[in-house]
Every structure is written in C-alpha cells, then in structure tokens.
C-alpha cells in the first residue's frame, strides 16, 4: 500500500525501534500467534520513524521539483499538501522565492505547538502561490489496512473495529482553535464511526460560528 497508513519493516529495524507493545493508541503492531509480522499500522509506525534518517532540505526540494514537473505535464497547476510541519513552511517559501516552486499550493498544518504559534501570529496566510489556512487531523486509518474506524467489526477481521488515530478531546480542541483563528479544520475520516464522531464535533463547533467551512476528507 502507498497511503501512509501502514509500513512493513524488517527484523533489524523492528529490534532497533525496541517495539514491545502489540497495540498502541491509534495504531497496531500486527502479530500471528503472538509473533510480530513486521506490519505496523498508523500510529505504530511512529516507533520506527524516529530510527530512519531524515531527508535533507536539498533532497526534499529535488523531489518537489520532480513532482511539480510531472504534474505540469498533465496540466495540473495546483495541489493540496495534506499535513506539513513548521519547517516545511520555510522550505516552500524558499523555493517560491527562487522561482523553483510555481504550483498553487494549499498547505494544511499538522497540529503542533509550532504550527499553532504560526497560525496565531499570522492568521490565514498567503505568500505568493502558497496558501496556509487550515489544520489537518487524522480521525482514523484506511479501509485497506483495516484502520478505518467502523461501527461494526470488519467482515474478515471480526475482532477489529479499526483505529481512532486522534482522540475526540484533541479533535474538539483543534476545532475550537481553528474557529478562533479563522482556519479550516480538514479531517481525514473514512469509517462510518469516525465520520459520526467528526460530524458531532463539527456540529458543536458550528453552534459558535455556523459560517465556517470545515471539511471531511
């Protein structure tokens, strides 16, 4: 799968990460007869992400330039980036200033302290073709990896209803923060249970400000 909701790691990396829990909040370490398979779902991937070397700024810029060129070949001139860290804002601005990033880019912020500080300082933000006015939240995982949060168990995995990646408390907090800052809240929601939770959170937020454009994606 190429969707950011599952990872398959070898024994060396598994041992380096010192994974001991079979399940974590919003994630799962898949096992067969109590033996880890190396398949990590959603938040369980955080165990190994810290062990991997980070891409350099130049590597990221090169990758973005290559992707941009391919998009232009298909006539696509704008895109959304669903979840960026604070460091990426500076990187995007640098590429725009040097003329290397020409795509219209609607970037969503991950819910971090640095990104919240940015939103409070700047409000809805635009730098030439870069637009920042939303926060990205993940309520659940994907159907294919059995991470989407369902009201009923999966038909081929009866013990599982899926995963709640972000607590209801945190999602409520983000919704009120976004209302205050004039930002959108863009929530990943696949399963019926996850969507029900998101709609309840949005309904409560819209009582305070009904003229707001949150979305589920």
Where are these regions (language model features)?
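Distinct, well-ordered alpha-helical segments
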Residues: 90-95, 116-121, 195-207
């Amino acid at each position: 799968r190429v969707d950011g909701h599952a990872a398959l790691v070898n024994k060396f990396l598994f041992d380096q990460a010192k994974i001991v829990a079979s399940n974590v909040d919003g994630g799962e370490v898949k096992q067969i007869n109590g033996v880890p398979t190396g398949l990590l779902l959603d938040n369980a991937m955080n165990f190994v992400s810290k062990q991997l070397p980070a891409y350099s700024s130049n590597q990221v810029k090169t990758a973005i330039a290559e992707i941009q060129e391919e998009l232009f070949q298909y006539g696509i001139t704008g895109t959304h980036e669903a979840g960026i860290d604070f460091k990426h804002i500076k990187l995007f601005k640098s590429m725009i200033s040097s003329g290397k990033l020409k795509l219209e880019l609607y970037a969503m912020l991950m819910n971090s302290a640095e990104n919240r500080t940015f939103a409070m300082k700047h409000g809805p933000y635009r730098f030439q073709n870069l637009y920042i006015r939303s926060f990205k939240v993940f309520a659940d995982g994907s159907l294919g990896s059995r991470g989407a949060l369902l009201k009923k168990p999966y038909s081929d995995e009866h013990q599982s209803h899926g995963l709640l990646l972000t607590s209801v408390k945190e999602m409520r907090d983000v919704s009120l923060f976004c209302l205050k800052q004039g930002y959108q809240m863009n929530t990943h929601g696949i399963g019926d249970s996850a969507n029900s939770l998101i709609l309840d959170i949005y309904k409560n937020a819209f009582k305070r400000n009904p003229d707001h454009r949150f979305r589920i994606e």
